[in-house]
Each structure stands twice: as structure tokens, then as C-alpha cells.
UniProtKB/Swiss-Prot annotation:
Descriptive protein name: Phosphoacetylglucosamine mutase
List of residues binding Mg(2+): 64, 276, 278, 280
Modified-residue entries (N-acetylmethionine), positions: 1
Ligand binding (substrate): 370-372, 496-500, 505
Regulation: Inhibited by Mn(2+), Cd(2+), Zn(2+), Cu(2+) and Be(2+).
pH note: Optimum pH is 7-7.5.
Annotated function: Catalyzes the conversion of GlcNAc-6-P into GlcNAc-1-P during the synthesis of uridine diphosphate/UDP-GlcNAc, a sugar nucleotide critical to multiple glycosylation pathways including protein N- and O-glycosylation.
Pathway: Nucleotide-sugar biosynthesis; UDP-N-acetyl-alpha-D-glucosamine biosynthesis; N-acetyl-alpha-D-glucosamine 1-phosphate from alpha-D-glucosamine 6-phosphate (route I): step 2/2
């Protein structure tokens, strides 16, 4: 390791004085003009991680659903999964090291992680469409090359596409071909094969309007359209030709504001969906004949997919386990429907994709979706082998069901949540089951809910257990919440500290919107009084 060369190169990627950043679930995110040093250093770290794992490592330059002026970076581990927690700590330490301490920090990481510095390293890089992304990705490459790493720059990619590339490169092509053409070919072939089983339906049923958040999803969906059959008509809106990234559009905007994005023309009962800025989240929605907006979030997506998978498994007579993984934010109606109607076991984890992904790996077929629309399905190696074997052996209805399951395996991006992949799965299932978006929405009715934030002096005064559904401290707060919940029908409430700011997040649901609002207000007040609230006291009616 040529520490002098690293120090020299680092001087042209100087760290702003006093800037401290934390590598979180989404990697690093902040204003784009504060990230040059972080990008250079993540190039260095990716090389060390590659040497340590003897694998290709990915670096994605994106800030997902954040405003266009922000940017960020995250590393992708060998099987396309998120960076290991111990290396998140290394990333934070390296990003925050002062200029004169950088060389020492690199040596410390190398020693602590037992990195063989003579091992070859290979890093792949992708970026979104933000104006700052190209220059920042060049800083990553500078970091990779100064440490002697080899690299391939894929240029513009969705985040899930980079995860796919990393997985392909580290599995000897077993997962697929590590090119953009390979990605489109794998997904489109599976979609075409799966859709062949659908009885013909009118064009109206197969038209989908997609809000691309003025992001990378638009470019990649345009490319993919050439691979898709005529039967699926996809109309793109907010495609980046005008309008800013994530500005009044995209999955996060639609979910948080509970209204359609700007820039999309919606007629009654038309099927619409939104991607987020880097195309790893998707949510569906429509307006009814009375003009009312209906949101179909990750909970309902998970319900549609898991019920379809269970039906196919019943058809082939296999006792493979299906599990659905949710967070405490999942609507209570979805949990009840899955457990009581579909008889599918549901498990709750802490908030954050890595927790859901990890839990989903415990099942033969693990379905996970956050309410925000980020999710996928994981198939165990044994389940995948069994399904592929049955697809060859079985005939008639059972054989057809096994082949459909095999196509579903290939259609999901098992490395991470992928808006394009999830969209194709959903469209295939709706066509196969002959469901309209209204019928899908009617599977169950969401309980009214309300989310609020309470400013506190120190968010660390609150600690939780039971997948963030119970407060452990301060003492007495959980008892107060329990007493408030008892006042309302079909109600529940929980509070959890924010991961990024000194606020406590409050979630409440009940049998009516009025009751959900009242419960959320009363719980907020309890938090304010017992957990060191600052500023204005919570008010009824917000």
C-alpha cells in the first residue's frame, strides 16, 4: 500500500473541516458538494473489502428519493447484499478521518479485518442521473486506482441493477450475465414465459402508467421496453426530460402525501405506479370514479405476491415454507389478512431493509416488503433446486404451476428490492389472476393510521424492544401508551427514535381516521411529557 501516493491523491479530495457523517442503511447521504472526499475514500474501502472477500465489490453513487441537490454512496457486498455491519463502521471511521490521519486509518482497517494487501481487487461502479453523480463517481475511481484496484464503470444504472451485476460476477454467471443486456434478457424472458399462461385480456387491462420520478428508472425502463411483449403497454411519465428528480413525484412523494404525483394524467380506475429516484421502490395507486385516490403500498404488494406463491405451492403439492416479513409500520389489516385468511405466517423485524432481508432468508420462500414499497422475494437454494427439478418432472396442472414458480424465481431480483423487477411480477400476477387494480385493492381495507414526529432533546432517552413495538425506557411510557390504546377499537400504537435526527416517530392506527388521529396526538403528548420534548407541545388536529 503506497501511503504517500494515497496522501497525495487525497489532498485533491480534501475533507471539509468538522464534517462528520454516518454510514447508515442507505450508506452516506448529504449535499452533493460535501461528498468528494467520501467518494474517494469509499473507492479505497471498496478495494480493501474486495481484497478481504476475494470478490468483486460494488459502489453505487445515488441518494435515492432525496432531493436532486443531495447525493450519496453505498457499497454492495459479494452476493449483491448490503455492506456487512462491521464494514459500515469502517466506512464511517474512514470517511470522518482527518486528512493527516487517513493513512493510519487505512492501515488500521487492513489490520483489523486481516486484509491480504497482495490480493487482487475488482470494483464495479454505477451511478444515478443526478447532475453531480458523474464527477463523484470519478472520485470513487480515483480511490480504487490509487490502491491498485481494477474496476469496471457501468455508468448509468438503477441501484438494483448494480446489485445484480455484483451478484452475477461473484457467482460465475450462475445468477445471470453481468451486463445490462443480460439483466433485461433474464427478466424479460421470465416475464414472457410467465405471462404466456394468462388468458387473453383486453388492452385496457394491460396498460400501466409509470411515474419514473424524473430519475434513472425512466432511462432503464425505456431501454427495457424493447425486450417486452406488445401485450404490456407501459406509458412513462416524469421521465427526466423536464422536471427535477423526486420533485412532487416518485414513490416517496406519493406515499407520504397520499396523492398522485404531478406530471401524470390519471383517468378513473387506471392502473398507475411510481418508482423512487434510484428505482428500488415501487408503489401502485388509482383514482376511483368519484375521484378518490387509492394507494396500494408495500403491504398490499406483499399480500398479492405471497398469496400467489402459496396457491402455486398448493397446486404442486409441495410443503415448502412461505414467510412474510414486515415491520411495525405494516398496516394491521394486512397482517390479519395474511395470517387469518391466507394462513401465511407473518414475522415482524426492526425497521430497515437489512433486518427484513436477513429474516426472509430463514424461509424456503421469504417475502419482504416495507410499506414504502421496497422489497423482493428470496428463495432458498434448496427450494430453488426443488422447484427447478419439479418443473422438469411434473406434467399437466402441477407441471404448469412448477414452471410458473420457476419463472417467478428468475423474475425477482433476489439481491435487493427492484422496482422494474417487482413491477413485472405484479403485472404478470394481475394478468394471470385476471384481477383489476380495484379487485386487488379490495383484498382487505387498510385501517386508518397517522404518523407524527415529536422533537426531543435527545432521542437516545427512548429505547425499544420487540421489533420496536414496545418501549423499554423511559419507564412508564409504554404503560401510558397501553392505556391510551385501550380507549379505541382495533387500535395499536408504537413510538421509536429516529435514526437520523432528535425526533421520536409516532405511529397509531384505529377503526376510524378520527380515532387514529386522536390516538396519535395523545401518544405524542405522552412522549413529549415523558421523553424530554422540546419546542411546541403537540396539538390536537396537528
Amino acid at each position: 500500500m503506497d501511503l504517500d501516493a494515497i496522501t497525495k491523491h487525497s489532498a485533491s479530495h480534501a475533507k471539509p473541516d468538522g464534517l462528520i457523517l454516518q454510514y447508515g442503511t442507505a450508506g452516506f447521504r448529504t449535499k452533493a458538494d460535501r461528498l468528494d472526499h467520501v467518494m474517494f475514500r469509499m473507492g479505497l474501502l471498496a478495494v480493501l473489502r474486495s481484497k478481504q472477500t476475494k470478490s468483486t465489490i460494488g459502489v453505487m453513487v445515488t441518494a435515492s428519493h432525496n432531493p436532486e441537490d443531495d447525493n450519496g454512496v453505498k457499497l454492495v457486498d459479494p452476493l449483491g447484499e448490503m455492506l456487512a455491519p462491521s464494514w459500515e463502521e469502517h466506512a464511517t471511521h474512514l470517511a470522518n478521518a482527518e486528512e493527516q490521519d487517513l493513512a493510519r486509518a487505512l492501515v488500521a482497517i487492513s489490520e483489523e479485518a486481516a486484509v491480504n494487501l497482495h490480493q487482487d481487487a475488482f470494483v464495479v461502479i454505477g451511478r444515478d442521473t443526478r447532475p453531480s453523480s458523474e464527477k463523484l463517481s470519478e472520485s470513487v475511481i480515483d480511490g480504487v486506482t490509487v490502491l491498485g484496484g481494477q474496476f469496471h464503470d457501468y455508468g448509468l444504472l438503477t441501484t438494483p441493477q448494480l446489485h445484480y451485476m455484483v451478484c452475477c460476477r461473484n457467482t460465475g454467471g450462475q445468477y445471470g450475465e453481468a451486463t445490462i443486456d443480460g439483466y433485461y434478457h433474464k427478466l424479460s424472458t421470465a416475464f414472457v414465459e410467465l405471462s404466456k399462461q394468462a388468458s387473453c385480456s383486453g388492452d385496457d387491462h394491460r396498460t400501466l402508467k409509470v411515474d419514473c420520478a424524473n430519475g434513472i428508472g425512466a432511462l432503464k425502463l425505456k431501454e427495457m421496453k424493447h425486450y417486452l411483449p406488445q401485450g404490456l403497454s407501459v406509458q412513462l411519465f416524469n421521465d427526466g426530460t423536464k422536471g427535477k428528480l423526486n420533485h412532487f413525484c416518485g414513490a416517496d412523494f406519493v406515499k407520504s402525501h397520499q396523492k398522485p404525483p404531478e406530471g401524470i394524467e390519471m383517468k378513473a380506475n387506471e392502473r398507475c405506479c411510481s418508482f423512487d429516484g434510484d428505482a428500488d421502490r415501487i408503489i401502485y395507486y388509482y383514482c376511483d370514479v368519484d375521484g378518490h385516490f387509492h394507494l396500494i403500498d408495500g403491504d398490499k404488494i406483499a399480500t398479492l405476491i405471497s398469496s400467489f406463491l402459496k396457491e402455486l405451492l398448493l397446486e404442486i403439492g409441495e410443503s415448502l415454507t412461505v414467510g412474510v416479513v414486515q415491520t411495525a409500520y405494516a398496516n394491521g389489516s394486512s397482517t390479519r389478512y395474511l395470517e387469518e385468511v391466507m394462513k401465511v405466517p407473518v414475522y415482524c423485524t426492526k425497521t430497515g431493509v437489512k433486518h427484513l432481508h436477513h429474516k426472509a432468508q430463514e424461509f424456503d420462500l421469504g417475502v419482504y416488503f416495507e410499506a414504502n414499497g421496497h422489497g423482493t422475494v428470496l428463495f432458498s437454494k434448496a427450494a430453488e433446486a426443488k422447484i427447478r427439478q419439479l418443473a422438469k418432472e411434473l406434467e399437466d396442472k402441477k407441471g404448469k404451476a412448477a414452471k410458473m414458480l420457476e419463472n417467478v424465481i428468475d423474475l425477482f431480483n433476489q439481491a435487493t428490492g427492484d422496482a422494474i423487477s417487482d413491477m413485472l411480477v405484479i403485472e404478470a400476477i394481475l394478468a394471470l389472476k385476471g384481477l383489476t387494480i380495484q379487485q386487488w385493492d379490495a383484498l382487505y381495507t387498510d385501517l386508518p393510521n397517522r404518523q407524527l414526529k415529536v422533537k426531543v432533546a435527545d432521542r437516545q432517552v427512548i429505547s425499544t424492544t420487540d421489533a420496536e413495538r414496545q418501549v423499554v425506557k423511559p419507564p412508564g411510557l409504554q404503560e401510558a401508551i397501553n392505556d391510551l390504546v385501550k380507549k379505541y377499537k382495533l387500535s395499536r400504537a408504537f413510538v421509536r427514535p429516529s435514526g437520523t435526527e432528535d425526533v421520536v416517530r409516532v405511529y397509531a392506527e384505529a377503526d376510524s381516521q378520527e380515532n387514529a388521529d386522536s390516538l396519535a396526538y395523545e401518544v405524542s403528548l405522552a412522549v413529549f411529557q415523558q421523553a424530554g420534548g422540546v419546542g411546541e407541545r403537540p396539538q390536537p388536529g396537528f
